[in-house]
């Protein structure tokens, strides 16, 4: 177990430790009201003290293991049918289940052009487009692996745009963008695609590619996108459970840390909680436990 994970959760470990320890000592006091230490063969004071120390140490170890290993979800707000929870998981496993369990919505942050070209062999392309390491890129690769071609994805996106009357805010020239799609849509634009086994994808325009096809976003634009997501979900979510990853970290270049990204999402969701009539899950990649705590 990494020490960084323990450090991130010290406050919660401490609270849990006191709860566990209090419960054990309360139970012990009840037991000792019926029998004495001597009845169970403990008569020396040093042995009694040792017994208390063992309880303290064991409950601390149990608290650390419980919080850092087994506790994977933390509910931060709940009211009626509305709920906001933070959990460790892999958004791709949620987005591509092997069998149907229940209807779910998975939010996939994409660029404002809704590009679907994932460039892995950077030696053979000028100004690579979607990185395979982003949620956007991983989603496209998983879609293709599940039997849906890039052309089919493009077709579904275009059909939804036409059906909803969503128009681009600008069209780039070949000089501005030599590869990929050239129609740019407003930040926060959402395209709905049906997946398999009860999964619906909300593709949300979050980052804008610059002249070198590098994704760019800001904290302010992310906040606006989150507001639009809540409004869109209120009218189109059908109360389905929804999953969203941390936005603004990594290759989106907003400059936010994992902790700042989590606090931003939590703040927006709690501020506009009147729009939440379903279960909202903020997903932190399980390998990022050392970077941010679900209890922050």
Q: What do these predicted regions represent?
A:
Residues 1-296:
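Macrodomain-like recognition of ADP-ribose-binding/processing modules
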